[in-house]
Amino acid sequence: MQDYKLPAGLRDNFGPQATQKESVRHYLTGLFQRHHYTLIETSLLEYRDVFGPYELQAESLYRILEADGQDLVLRPDLTLPIARFLVTTNVSLPTSFAYVGEQFRRNRQLTGLYNQSTQAGIELVGFQSRRAELECLTVISELNRDLFNGRLLVELGQARLADLVLADLPANERQKEAIKAALFNKNVPDYEAAIAPFKRERHYPFLAEWTWLFGKADVVEKMVAPLWVNPAAREAMQEVLDLAKLVAQLGDQELLVDFSTAAPQAYYTGVTFKAYADQTSTYLVSGGRYDNLLANFQEKSEPAIGLGIDVTLIAQLLERSAPRDQAKPTLVFCQLADWPTFAKRYGGDPAYEACLADSLVAARTQAAATGQQLKVMNEEGDLIDA
């Protein structure tokens, strides 16, 4: 007999998991509508070239070969399809989009990670003002409050900071890449070895402290104040610190700044943000500014900022923390001729569930198996003990 298993890395959702995921999706759609974003659904299949700016190896993509030889992929990302949409339509800018959809990305085997996930997010295109960053962080704050009671940890960073700091360091590209790799991977021994040749440079005091430049904004601000960096790097850091002060006023949530973190993707150009839950080291929300994104598809670029929300992971965390002793609906058995009466009287009441068994004996068996109370509806529509 053939084994009809799912391909590795994919899964089915049912029962409480599927219910929780749909609940999160419904909440996010309502959140987006309250912020007056335009909902968008892009195609699940795209040409491979759409994801040229995306840092992903070919073996990580689900690929489909068209009859004409064109290379299609199941989308591994939902931001770049929106960029493709913008340059192939006449949508006027600025505009604010929101989406919920599936993405597919092959992970290494034996990592325990799934290759399919549901992502929601927003894309604010054509907005240069820092108000766009605050809009994204307000959405994160509302999600944090509504779904996690403020328990999410929000982290701010700067995508270009490493390149700005190292821009005028007298080092070759190989040395600069070694510094960045060790910094982003939090590999302190390799990092110290990478910066050792530059002890005589005025950059060195900052380089020596760089791996420690994370924490609460006021603490980090005091740490960087006496350290020399070039004006462009100083301005980039101050932008993040100023933004952190405004975000801190949004409500009760833990907020950190990390100047030693990598951008989520290579196309990011400014402030970045992530949100973590205490139950996982994987971020639930990530995003930031990417003002050069449309330049990959057309000559003219547009300022843009956005965030992605991992619906699948959020649903998993909420489902795990949900109380297990929730009351089950009462199972109601009735004769076939009395079904219209049941539907009118009890059909819209979540406290009751129609029993689809053919007989009262089968209904009792079903109730025993599911742990539900069983009632019988008589001809008058009253419920009596079974």
From Swiss-Prot:
It holds the Pfam family tRNA-synt_His. GO terms for molecular function: catalytic activity, acting on a protein; transferase activity. Pathway: Amino-acid biosynthesis; L-histidine biosynthesis; L-histidine from 5-phospho-alpha-D-ribose 1-diphosphate: step 1/9. Keywords: Amino-acid biosynthesis, Cytoplasm, Histidine biosynthesis. It is found in: Cytoplasm. GO terms for cellular component: cytoplasm. GO terms for biological process: L-histidine biosynthetic process. Signal peptide: none annotated. The keyword Cytoplasm applies. Gene3D superfamilies: Bira Bifunctional Protein, Domain 2. Its main location: cytoplasm. The keyword Nucleotide-binding does not apply. CDD domains: HisRS-like_core. InterPro entries: aa-tRNA-synth_II/BPL/LPL, HisRS-like_core, HisRS/HisZ, HisZ. Heteromultimer composed of HisG and HisZ subunits. Belongs to the class-II aminoacyl-tRNA synthetase family. HisZ subfamily. This function is generally fulfilled by the C-terminal part of HisG, which is missing in some bacteria such as this one. Required for the first step of histidine biosynthesis. May allow the feedback regulation of ATP phosphoribosyltransferase activity by histidine. This is ATP phosphoribosyltransferase regulatory subunit. It comes from Limosilactobacillus fermentum (strain NBRC 3956 / LMG 18251).
